[in-house]
Design a protein with these regions (language model features):
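N-terminal, post-signal peptide beta-strand-biased segments of exported outer-membrane/organellar beta-barrel
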Residues: 4, 8-114, 321
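Outer-membrane beta-barrel porins/channels
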Residues: 8-30, 95-336
Length: 336
């Protein structure tokens, strides 16, 4: 299984499955992610299984993608200037497309779906009037996490009628996400002994979902192609196995709580539709994508901050339905 390099400056990946990766091959990503209606005899389409039927006879299409990113941050903290800069270089996708029979094509892809990478701190300052923390002093909470979710897709595309194709694909999601918090108290009274508390959460994901798609080309000539396409991802509960442990002191000392549960973590139902126009030199694509994150996801995240008794405080994580428009233009002066 491919493992993404951990990028530790994305605090919002503390929640759920983390940050979604932009889907598609390099060509689609350079077009703003548009490509639901893209139909080509030379490019693998990762967004719509109906495009698999475009694979020409006696031809095998293979795609391998890499992704590099540069991060730079400069800020002033307490009057002191600080800078951070680093590069990442990761595998992004492997995909192929091949004909099975006349007007029937097979497609396969292995791509990262989401990734987690963060490290942050929270300070609870000493308050002499606080009935709980008055004799403890300052407390520092450290949060960090890393992991990823990978998607494997296998599908068939069929052209039952001229210029009209349908497709179906099975999607397998798997991965591991690890989240850790450490509470470190600092005694200021010289009385009592206080030890660190370590919490570890592991999310193990393994689930199968599905996707269907259609494409229709009302204009298909030697000089130009106009295609309309749509795809629907069924989504559903990933049903991850979650192992939670809390230790006092360190991982070699007493386990306060350890259990394994199944947490509800739902991928949204996704509807996407688009239009794609191609000539020898130009390509223009427009997509609309709707995801119902808010209709099916509810989650309670634990903070690691002490509440009443042995419990940790918690808060609700809000998910919102999203609508996304993607537009891309490509110009190739001399394609052949």
């Amino acid at each position: 299984r491919q493992r993404q390099m951990c990028i530790r400056d994305r605090p919002y990946t503390m929640y759920g499955i983390g940050e979604q990766n932009t889907p598609g091959t390099l060509q689609m990503r350079s077009m703003g992610g548009a490509g639901v209606a893209m139909r080509s005899v030379s490019t693998v389409n990762l967004l719509n299984p109906a495009a698999y039927s475009a694979a020409p006879q006696k031809t095998f299409l293979f795609n391998f993608g890499l992704e590099g990113q540069n991060y730079y941050n400069a800020q002033t903290v307490g009057g002191v200037g600080k800078r951070t800069a680093y590069n990442t270089f990761n595998f992004h996708d492997i995909a192929f497309q091949m004909p099975v029979a006349k007007r029937l094509g097979l497609g396969f892809s292995l791509t990262p779906y989401s990734s987690v990478g963060y490290r942050t701190k929270y300070y609870h300052e000493y308050d002499p009037e606080d009935p709980i923390y008055a004799n403890v002093g300052n407390i520092q909470y450290n949060y960090q996490g890393e992991g990823d979710v990978t998607e494997v897709k296998v599908g068939l595309g069929w052209e039952p009628f001229k210029n009209f194709s349908v497709g179906i694909a099975a999607q397998y999601y798997w991965g591991d996400i690890d989240r850790t918090f450490v509470m470190t108290p600092t005694a200021i009274t010289g009385e009592g002994t206080f030890t660190s508390t370590v919490g570890q959460d592991n999310y193990s994901i393994s689930s199968i979902k599905g996707q269907v798609g259609v494409q229709w080309s009302p204009v298909l000539t030697q000089k130009r192609i106009l295609t309309i396409g749509a795809a629907f991802d069924i989504g559903g509960d990933l049903n991850p196995e979650v192992t939670k442990r809390i230790y006092v002191g360190d991982i070699y000392n007493t386990t306060v709580k350890g259990d394994t549960t199944h947490l509800k973590m739902v991928l949204p139902r996704q509807f996407s539709a688009g239009i794609y126009y191609q000539t020898a030199k130009w390509a223009v694509g427009v997509d609309y994508v709707y995801q119902n994150w808010g209709d099916s996801n509810t989650a309670t995240e634990m903070t690691g901050v002490s509440g009443s008794g042995d419990a940790r405080t918690s808060y609700e994580v809000a998910y919102t339905n999203t609508s996304t428009f993607k537009v891309g233009v490509e110009y190739t002066p001399s394609r052949y």
